[in-house]
């Protein structure tokens, strides 16, 4: 069973870029593994580092700014997670420490993969995201409160409403991935299998 997501308060980092694709999130040369851990070190590798080995941080990239170290909420622009389909993208984001991504829109496959990996993608309007970017840039180090149960983001003096499909919301709040959902019906599955005839080779 995955970790339950009900509420989260976290430091916000503003990634002021639209159409951030999955190859930027986790470049293809780091996709050899099939486990979910270890990808955070290579998140935004080509932007975070000046060298191919990832040993020389790029001081001009926002994730490397001192005031955003430990950020767990990523604020981005439209069409986040576009490009090729790779579940490694939410793996890298969660392994780095992100719990929430806020943007006006997401690529469909990335959006679905995020829920499967307990990464909450929050859609707000362009105008609301503009407000949040202005707020974060004026207040480096600000924290947002994200309440999945109430479907609200509290930022500064304002509250922003978002909507999540009821089934996905239920799964995240109860820490249920596809395996967890299946295990909820373990008794019924076992009963069905017990009633099936056994075949001999």
Swiss-Prot record:
<dbReference type="InterPro" id="IPR000573">
    <property type="entry name" value="AconitaseA/IPMdHydase_ssu_swvl"/>
</dbReference>
<comment type="pathway">
    <text>Amino-acid biosynthesis; L-leucine biosynthesis; L-leucine from 3-methyl-2-oxobutanoate: step 2/4.</text>
</comment>
<keyword id="KW-0028">Amino-acid biosynthesis</keyword>
<comment type="similarity">
    <text>Belongs to the LeuD family. LeuD type 1 subfamily.</text>
</comment>
<keyword id="KW-0456">Lyase</keyword>
<dbReference type="InterPro" id="IPR015928">
    <property type="entry name" value="Aconitase/3IPM_dehydase_swvl"/>
</dbReference>
<dbReference type="InterPro" id="IPR004431">
    <property type="entry name" value="3-IsopropMal_deHydase_ssu"/>
</dbReference>
<dbReference type="InterPro" id="IPR050075">
    <property type="entry name" value="LeuD"/>
</dbReference>
<dbReference type="GO" id="GO:0009098">
    <property type="term" value="P:L-leucine biosynthetic process"/>
</dbReference>
<dbReference type="Pfam" id="PF00694">
    <property type="entry name" value="Aconitase_C"/>
</dbReference>
<protein>
    <recommendedName>
        <fullName>3-isopropylmalate dehydratase small subunit</fullName>
        <ecNumber>4.2.1.33</ecNumber>
    </recommendedName>
</protein>
<keyword id="KW-0100">Branched-chain amino acid biosynthesis</keyword>
<keyword id="KW-0432">Leucine biosynthesis</keyword>
<dbReference type="GO" id="GO:0009316">
    <property type="term" value="C:3-isopropylmalate dehydratase complex"/>
</dbReference>
<comment type="subunit">
    <text>Heterodimer of LeuC and LeuD.</text>
</comment>
<comment type="function">
    <text>Catalyzes the isomerization between 2-isopropylmalate and 3-isopropylmalate, via the formation of 2-isopropylmaleate.</text>
</comment>
<dbReference type="GO" id="GO:0003861">
    <property type="term" value="F:3-isopropylmalate dehydratase activity"/>
</dbReference>
<dbReference type="InterPro" id="IPR033940">
    <property type="entry name" value="IPMI_Swivel"/>
</dbReference>
